[in-house]
Amino acid sequence: MYSIDITLKLSPIPISVQRKEEAAADALYQTIINAMRSPNPELLELTCEKQTDKKVAVLSDQISAVIVSQKSGAASTGRAPGFVALATE
């Protein structure tokens, strides 16, 4: 699972959507970068492949950064990395 995190101007909380495949994450990254470079603001409508009912719309001129990262192991299951759940007897 790949996470695309978008940081907005004047907002400390990023917007995140996920893609299952690296190629799809890279394609979305390029789409966002191209919209940021455009002199005219564009409305980007994004969906998430992990939470299929999640939708977000963002104006491209409000984006200050975009990050693509791979989520694996504990991070994709919602558990903090470095912690192990021990079974009790």
Curated annotation (Swiss-Prot):
It comes from the Bacteria. InterPro entries: UPF0367. Belongs to the UPF0367 family. HAMAP family: UPF0367 (MF_01360). NCBIfam families: PRK13683.1. This is UPF0367 protein MAE_19160.
